[in-house]
Amino acid sequence: VPGMVGDGIRMAWEAGAGSEGTNMELASVAGADSRAMIGDVSDSAKMNATAFCPATPTFQQPNLMVNLLGERFMDEEEMGNGTFLANAVARQRARVGFVIYDAATARLYENEGLDWPMAISQTTKVPNIDAEIRKAVADGNHDLFVADSLDDLAAQTGIEAAALKATVEEYNTACDTGRDDVFHKRTAYLRSLREPPFYAGTVRPGGYGSLGGIKINHRTEVVTKDQDVIPGLYAAGTDACAIYADSYVFVLPGNTMGFALNSGRMAGENASDYVKAPAG
């Protein structure tokens, strides 16, 4: 965010504040050009136009996901929780996963809509998926792939081909029987991969935003590393939010805002009481 460069945290530290929970929230990026999300991203509109294409949300759905070893590594239904997904992907080789679906699933998303809408939208239908993905690839998006065979897909992505084909065969059997014995994904999200072209998009961990920095107590008073109160100094919001470590609680939407709102109220009230208190 323009203008937010850590001045408040640095001033508090210079005043003797302890440091606590200084971290970046772990989040996931799926089906987007990760190179466009590195460096100066202050112009969010420009970044979004470069990183995302209209078909990006199709790679944020609960379809088959594998790592570079060609293995599934989590229940794809949990992709809806960016924290769970990012933590799982971060443990894989090269910290990357691949969501894969075929032409039949693409038609489903075009005609009936996505399983999960990933943003505020008036429709969940995604038109012209094949054309949009091919255009993104032609424009230089190195995180999306189109292939006419699984061998070709493996060659493009670097996934181990034999393992990928074995996983797809096992997954297709689960789709046919309606029973996922590996991760017990619900039948509604079991869709086979048999009809080319095959589409893949990378899933990578990324930083959602900074958290923590200033150590406070339950009265929002700033304290030193030894928990000694610094009189008259209060802090609130994300600069003092150390309740998540590196994993935001996506199952409780708005909780960062809730902490900011209420810690700000508490800090304001306590600072007012401090100013009004008799000297000495």
What are these regions (language model features)?
Residues 223-224, 228-278:
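Catalytic phosphate/nucleotide-handling subdomain of diverse soluble enzymes
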Residues 27-32, 78, 82-85, 205-211, ...:
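Glycine-rich phosphate/pyrophosphate-binding beta-alpha loops
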Residues 91-198, 270, 274:
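Helix-rich C-terminal "cap"/substrate-channel and partner-interaction subdomain
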Residues 41-88:
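Phosphate/diphosphate-binding loops
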Residues 1-36, 251, 257-266:
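Glycine-rich loop(s) and the adjacent beta-strand/alpha-helix scaffold that form part
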Residues 71-118, 229-245:
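Gly/Pro-rich active-site capping loops and adjacent beta-alpha segments
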Residues 149, 163-247:
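A glycine-rich dinucleotide-binding beta-alpha-beta segment and adjacent secondary-structure elements
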